[in-house]
């Protein structure tokens, strides 16, 4: 029974974490309870005892730096050696883990996997590790998403074709001008001329504002029919067309003025206020961040000055005038 107790105590001793600064070269551990240790410095009188923790060894480093500054080189060498040892241990454990992963794993015999309609294996009931199961699940989800996207594309295509099939028959001499404010139907002239570029009785019709310069560049040159002598049988139709174009131009100008006034009122009411509020918030955040940085820099400079004064108590600043 005593042998078992001694063995368990030795195992606990081995499991205790001992930092490199307390390995016996600079400090000697006298007593350790958990993480708390009582040590003696190897370069101080033997009656001096220091207490600390193995998880926070900053006070031990500061003692060497303040009382035994000649040992800083040795402390640096010990630190480098401890880091190299830790690196070698990590690389060794990594190699062991890789060799364990490469070892063959016994897999039970699996039944024939059922194939879906598209030829992708979906039903896989094999005794595989959890990593393969997650990979299989990812493949399933990607396949399902791809299938849903294909179904949505085909549905959109069918809807568009059905809409095209259900469109009413529009005569060739009828044009539809679509605006953001109102829908205006205009009778076009025979011969392919556009109503947006035709002027009657010295009143030009404005082109569509939303179509852009590229649309205007693609249009043919404007034809002034007021200077062309009318053909027999077309005088009545041209007169009715001129009156309809006058009505269209008046309605178009009225709708344009209304939309411009509405947009200007909306711009004056809302966006300027939003922009100003956003600018105020941004400036407040910037000023707060600058203030915090100034305070941090001020405290750092005060700390540096106090540290220098502590390390050099007899220093007196004598400026050369």
UniProtKB/Swiss-Prot annotation:
The keyword Coiled coil applies. Keywords: Activator, Coiled coil, Nucleus, Transcription, Transcription regulation. Changing residue 79 to M: In stil-1; induces female infertility due to germ ovary defects. The keyword Transcription applies. GO terms for biological process: female sex determination; female sex differentiation; germ-line sex determination; oogenesis; positive regulation of DNA-templated transcription. Residues 146-166, 227-248 are annotated as: Disordered. It comes from the Eukaryota. Residues 74-103, 147-167, 272-292 form a coiled coil. GO terms for molecular function: chromatin binding. Germ cells specific. Expressed in all germ cells. During the first instar larvae, it is expressed in all germ cells of both sexes. In third instar larvae, it decreases in male germ cells while it remains in female germ cells. In adult ovary, it is expressed in cells of the germarium, including the stem cells. In the early previtellogenic stages, it is highly expressed in the nurse cells. During vitellogenesis, it is not translocated into the maturing egg. In testes, it is only expressed during some steps of male germline differentiation. Residues 235-244 have a biased composition (Low complexity). One of its GO terms (cellular component) is nucleus. Residues 146-162 have a biased composition (Basic and acidic residues). It is found in: Nucleus. Essential in the female germline for proper survival, sex determination and differentiation. Participates in the transcriptional activation of Otu. Does not regulate the expression of Ovo. This is Protein stand still. It comes from Drosophila melanogaster.
